[in-house]
Amino acid sequence: MSEIKKIATRDSYGNTLVELGKEHDNLVVLDAYLAGATKTGVFKKEFPERHIDCGIAEGNMAGIAAGLATCGKVPFMSSFAMFAAGRAFEQVRNSIGYPHLNVKIGATHAGISVGE
């Protein structure tokens, strides 16, 4: 039986985005000025042309992700859970949910720890 290695959830998220990026040329990662905290910076280092820093503007990030999805990209939005759910709710519902667009939302830091 192999040994199980513990890894922080956010580290796993960043590493998995890189693995998926190697397999899928249409994968794009967006973050809200949180590349270090959400570990999307790992993806940015590997694929700088497929990473978009949207600044502290989760609602706008949802709109950008929706636009990219309509053009055949598979966007991964990344932010703190509080802001991904709270600040971007209407844009996610109206621009992504209603038209059933293929957008993924990675919401980190949802609890009382950072997932170390």
What do the PLM-derived regions correspond to, one by one?
Residues M1-E116:
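Thiamine diphosphate
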